[in-house]
Amino acid sequence: QRQMCIRDRYEAGCKVVSSYPGTPSTEITEAVAKYDEVYAEWAPNEKVAMEVALGASIGGARSFCGMKHVGLNVAADPLYTAGYTGVTAGMVIAVADDPGMHSSQNEQDSRHHAIASKTMMIEPSDSGECKEFAKAAFELSEKFDVPVIVRLSTRVSHSQSAVELCEREERENIPYEKNIQKYVMMPGNAIRRHPVVEARMKAIADYAETSPLNKVEMNDTKIGVITSGISYQYAKEALGDKASYLKLGIVNPMPIQIIKDFAAKCEKVYVIEELDDVIETHCKKNGVNVIGKELFSLMGEISQTIVAEKILGEKNEYITFEDNVPVRPPVMCPGCPHRGLFYCLHKLGVMVSGDIGCYTLGATAPLCAMDSTICMGASISGLHGFNKARGAEAEKKSVAVIGDSTFMHSGMTGLVNVAYNSTNSTVIILDNSITGMTGHQQNPTTGKNLKGDPAYAVDLEMLCHSLGIKSVRVVDPYHMAETEAVIKEELAKEEPSVIISRRPCALLKYVKHNPPLKVNKDKCVGCKQCLKIGCPAISIHDGKCVIDHTQCVGCGICKEMCKLGAICD
């Protein structure tokens, strides 16, 4: 689905792509990197990505940026102003919502951003529509002088189907013309642009009444369903020809007359939508009687089973098993460089202000070495606030942890604040040489760009010094005794400090692993000390430690944990 989004951007003559990785949107930009005709990059964060896309549009080239739903929060500043300025060439934004929070810290509904920013939003329901809507998005962006958001969801993003490919349509850049009143958003110009924006949204709403992106399917009229996106697929599978459907492809601004006409033909009308009651509210405020969140939850995903149960009263029968397979919790990979560091933090009993990344798993048992995780970059700012609230004693017993990519995303300003507003905070940057959680994307510290070509690599040590931090130390988290000693030393200092925990991600292809470790059964007493690091390669059988050679990468952390010498090379 995600690759279809970018295939049609390619076919539509898109020239500039700038995104920040975030599940489930990442693969859109990875796919476009294969096309030489399109310039594609990973930006340091979503705000920069959207600004790059807007700049390319002003420069006359069709542009695109992609992100997950919480990334749109980061990009909200340029988005809301772009709603006023409009565009020159078509500008399309893909945002992937995550109902069910499969890989996210919240379940927000991006439709609210489209409403508040007064931009257009369309929502495909399958691969074919992803491709069709992507091309339409550029045309609509240029027709109505507006950024167009394509809303995806986890299930739409993670599905696939056959589609028909077309050739690329090469387009010359639109000639650049200086337009201060349109693009310089000082108050006087913004005041003049606002009526233009309102008139534009009215024109889009009028267009939505007859747009082919909104589709009506009339079957049995006892049940009518108004829906959009993946919810259409659930409804169609559950109800089939027992219901008629109005599938809204344009979800902001929404039409009203087509909704009223559809509802008038049906005895009972249901609104099926995941997350918030956006369509339902639109219907009810315009006098259309619908049934929505009385039946369907504001939380989590909908499914065909839920639709059948709520509307038809049909319950599926399931086979139950006496012995349920235990759920395997997410864990850090064998050889993960973060494991040793988090064990040290757990051992020291410090408060850990956490951040977004693979290392968030440091909060899980048995390490339990993280106290908070809010959003990208919040670890450093949060630690500063924590220490200001609790005073000098807290400074000696608290740290922030943040990944290299996350630090480049939004951690630098927090570190500037620590130096500028003076707390003796200790910040640990987990430098694993990649953006790990979203699938090994390059970032400004890795020395390579999106296409794998050599690029400038930010020197983290020099950067931290330039931001006002005098004490910057580098440790190898595989060496836990040294790492623990450095953490103690930095916590004791009467100044802010940074520790860079540097070791490449164990899953990187170029990383060479050591031979798997072995267990001397005669020395092992079954003390289970080695289990405290939470490595999935280690287990206990018949009272003795066992190492799975198919998983072990020979990192040596468990060997350092075993004081009896039972784990050896």
Predicted regions, residues:
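Thiamine diphosphate
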Residues: 1-3, 7-127, 155, 218-219, 363-500, 510-511, ...
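Conserved thiamine diphosphate
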Residues: 98-147, 153, 188, 330, ...
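Short helix-loop-beta junction
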Residues: 31-37, 236-246, 462-468
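Flexible, low-complexity linker and terminal segments
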Residues: 1-3, 12, 124-332, 337-338, ...
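Short acidic, glycine/serine/threonine-rich loops at helix termini
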Residues: 28-31, 54, 75-79, 101-108, ...
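A glycine-rich helix N-cap at a beta->alpha junction
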Residues: 37-44, 85-96, 178, 420-431, ...
